[in-house]
């Protein structure tokens, strides 16, 4: 079902939506009268460059990560205003995006009549609250990860909000558009893997302690559970095959650090490792580690019966492809087998191609993903379509991690992952 075209026919003239107060799901549902009938944008599965004269007027909130995108370079976008609670970050945003208008807070920015969409790069636990604030004032939203914070209730509140207001929501998951993930997606669509029966993804990021304090006070990152930040890994499979993660078994490791003994999330783990089952019966292993004798990485590997693809590994391997072969050989124990073919893979720079408008055909953050995220959101609004990482895709990346952390707290109990299906 497609959204009413008239509602989206003129982005620049969008009016404010009716307001909804409060941020608990129960209060939200009660006060909204269960008004969840907002229609969805038409689906389109692939990026294609097709600029239009109409421009999206966007407001950027968050002068840290929010400074690393290319809104000002996109031919169909205007950076109308910026915002951050800190003056130094407001000035940084204004300088990066060559924007003369700044607001002291998101709450002020979303009231502006000359803004169509808001890019939310604020503290993780506030993403849902800020999405609600933006949408109740008639603004489309792209949000940093994760889409929802730590609870299923938050995830469902986000979904209810997007349904209620019928506006566009997208999560800015970088791994979806890392260059090797784009390659894996193309291999899968071409059928080169054969049966892709097993995958692995890992996000290893030591050194985050440097973000735990600001001006002597704890930030939201202090003591964050690894699986509450799962999307850099989960997207590596879900975005490639379209599978959904349906069951989780997870184990965690921690030590006697004061950070793990006293944090806002009651999280006892530095590292968490999960095994997921997919709706197709396949296995998917995910490691998210904040500490240990390992080299940092954000990568994956996809194992099929005809071909396997290994993204670059920090220990020096990859990217490589292994193909099943026909020539027979004996292994070191004398067993006869078909000899696999091992080959180096020369990773294309997909950001140099016509997948992007010409001004965005340059490298960018997180393995070239930021220009793709910029284009996908703007293009979805301009051409009245559903963004690839819409609210349903976002929850398919986010919710499995919430469940996995609960499994780790229960010493590896197998838990079901709630499913949120996109209407046909």
Spans of model-derived segments:
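C-terminal glycine/acidic-rich active-site capping loop/insertion
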Residues: 265, 277-278, 301, 306-389, ...
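C-terminal helix-rich "cap/oligomerization" subdomain common to oxidoreductases
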Residues: 3, 29-52, 117-120, 164, ...
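Predominantly a Rossmann-like dinucleotide-binding segment in NAD(P)-dependent oxidoreductases
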Residues: 64-67, 168-170, 175-267, 272-273
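N-terminal Rossmann-like dinucleotide-binding module
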Residues: 32-97
